[in-house]
């Protein structure tokens, strides 16, 4: 978005996209806290608005329902994984890359980011019994699958929308969903976060390798990376 567009929006009483995201995330934080403390059924839109310091009308301008208020904080809970997958260099194995990024995360994560991660874990736990929150979690998992498709396509030299890539991405994303739920449950049950963190990185790498039949996980030599074939022709041959 250009500065001119942002300025025009503001002059007309509008809101920049960056500001809109910040407001939605703040609403989501307070909604998640209330959902965890008193349940989804026990929480109203008016209570969420009061907790954030906004009008109820403003809440409904940003969200279609009170349950959908959880979506930004749930999506935030997988953002580190998505960022790590996006930045995975061809010359590194998945294990090496996750180990490097995990060390950086520990040194750079802010208190607010830690708090958001904790709220995300709690919403994922609530999603086990709250269908509307389950929708928010599955939406986040769908985004992981889409990002995985792009990563896998790059490493295999295939098209992101090809059948083989989509199958690999779907299987790997399902495995990552289970790992996230397992790790989150462990954290809420009091398991040492350091132990779970080390386990989860190993689980993720192993899950991606297993889900893709070993096709993804190893380093890729740039000068040996395969060129993208005509996948339609390959599918027809099969």
PLM regions and their residue ranges:
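N-terminal intrinsically disordered/low-complexity leader segments
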Residues: 1-22, 208-238
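Hydrophobic/aromatic residues within well-ordered alpha-helical segments
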Residues: 23, 77, 98, 102, ...
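Residue-level preference for short helical/loop micro-motifs built around acidic side chains
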Residues: 41-42, 67-68, 76
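Amphipathic alpha-helical packing segments from all-alpha helical-bundle domains
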Residues: 124, 131-156, 166-170
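Hydrophobic/aromatic-rich alpha-helical bundle segments in the mid-to-C-terminal region
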Residues: 138, 155-202, 216-219
């Amino acid at each position: 978005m250009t500065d001119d567009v942002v300025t025009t929006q503001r002059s007309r009483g509008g809101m920049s996209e960056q500001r809109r995201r910040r407001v939605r995330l703040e609403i989501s934080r307070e909604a998640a806290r209330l959902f965890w403390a008193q349940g989804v059924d026990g929480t109203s839109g008016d209570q969420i608005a009061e907790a954030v310091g906004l009008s109820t009308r403003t809440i409904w301008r940003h969200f279609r329902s009170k349950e959908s208020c959880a979506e930004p904080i749930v999506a935030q809970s997988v953002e580190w994984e998505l960022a790590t997958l996006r930045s995975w260099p061809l010359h590194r194995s998945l294990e090496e890359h996750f180990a490097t990024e995990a060390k950086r995360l520990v040194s750079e994560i802010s208190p607010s980011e830690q708090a958001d991660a904790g709220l995300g874990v709690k919403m994922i736990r609530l999603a086990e019994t709250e269908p509307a929150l389950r929708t928010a979690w599955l939406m986040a998992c769908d985004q992981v699958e889409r990002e995985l498709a792009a990563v896998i396509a790059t490493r295999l030299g295939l098209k992101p929308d090809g059948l083989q890539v989509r199958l690999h991405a779907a299987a790997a994303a399902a495995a990552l969903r289970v790992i996230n739920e397992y790790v989150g449950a462990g954290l809420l049950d009091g398991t040492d976060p350091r132990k779970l963190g080390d386990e989860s990185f190993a689980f993720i790498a192993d899950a991606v390798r297993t889900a893709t039949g070993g096709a993804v996980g190893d380093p890729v030599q740039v000068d040996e990376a395969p060129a993208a074939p005509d996948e339609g022709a390959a599918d027809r041959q099969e």
